[in-house]
Amino acid sequence: MSMMFLYEALRAAIDEEMGKDSNVFIVGEDVGHYGGSYKVTKDLHVKYGDLRVLDAPIAENSFTGMAIGAAMTGLRPIVEGMNMGFMLLAFNQISNNLSMLQYTSGGNFNIPVVIRGPGGIGKQLAAEHSQRLESCFQSIPGLQIVACSTAYNAKGLLKSAIIEKKPILFLEHVLLYNLKGFVPDEEYYLPLDKAEVVRSGSDVTIVTYSRMRYHVLAAVEKLVLNGQDPEIIDLISLKPLDLHTISKSIKKTHKIVIVEECAQTGGIAAELISLINTYLYDELDSPAVRLSSKDVPIPYNGNLEKSTLIQPDQIVDVVTNLLQYKT
């Protein structure tokens, strides 16, 4: 086992897959000589050359479209968005080409493209650099969405995404790049469609993903001191949702709280609650609860920014009240 930063685990995943398959290449703004905005691709251009670690102009629609065309010829592009908010400029390419071409070509083309890069609410990065776009992209048919949260799952998930035949949107939280964790020295892959049970418990199911995993863990420390026994599930796969793992937990706890960073309207929690009400309603002893960011642009001011996000103490209060709910 080696201790590494999350961004180093991502780099290791890309390096290993590029070393195994000459069809894998990465394209994006400053991915080459600069090494990427968060140094995920640092020095890869030295090892693999400027054609496989390709610096692109500031034109997300252009280099995303190029990557889709490259995938149609048999290559395996990794597209780095310098910031996920900028990938809105490629929304046409993602929604009308990337996700649909396998279907519209009658299965003649696979489109093995990974779109990855930093997103989420950072530290005073202001509105345009603090986009939470999982709720936008989840409505696109044919696009799978994965959110990493540890150095371990970042590497294993990205390696699996790179060898997939279908397009993957791979979400990396801007505040998790410097998170450290142990990563196995031997090669490994992780399933892209499975949630992780982070902590087993019997009182209530708390479902979360990405950075909010750590807000939930902080809240659970306090809940445990109060004699409560929550189960924590990290979704990892935001589309499709791993309803099997969630179902097993709900049938044990009969209560669920969903904690997310994306805005409440049309968020991941909204979709999950819809599925729970359809398939697991009779298993619940109380209504499903969601804790989401406020439906506002993210302020630059630090105090205002913090006020838009769900904080650990809010999770503690909601879970405590939920456990007192009487049917």
Curated annotation (Swiss-Prot):
Cofactors demanded by this protein: thiamine diphosphate
Chief location category: plastid
Binding positions for thiamine diphosphate per the UniProt entry: E60
Gene3D superfamilies from the UniProt entry: 3.40.50.920, 3.40.50.970
Subunit structure: Heterodimer of an alpha and a beta chain.
Keyword Plastid on entry: yes
Amino-acid positions noted as binding K(+) in the UniProt annotation, renumbered to this chain: V113, A161, I162, E164
Keyword Phosphoprotein part of the UniProt annotation: no
Listed GO MF terms: metal ion binding; pyruvate dehydrogenase (acetyl-transferring) activity
Protein name in UniProt: Pyruvate dehydrogenase E1 component subunit beta
Lineage, opening ranks: Eukaryota, Rhodophyta, Bangiophyceae, Cyanidiales, Cyanidiaceae
Function, as annotated: The pyruvate dehydrogenase complex catalyzes the overall conversion of pyruvate to acetyl-CoA and CO(2). It contains multiple copies of three enzymatic components: pyruvate dehydrogenase (E1), dihydrolipoamide acetyltransferase (E2) and lipoamide dehydrogenase (E3).
Keywords: Chloroplast, Metal-binding, Oxidoreductase, Plastid, Potassium, Pyruvate, Thiamine pyrophosphate
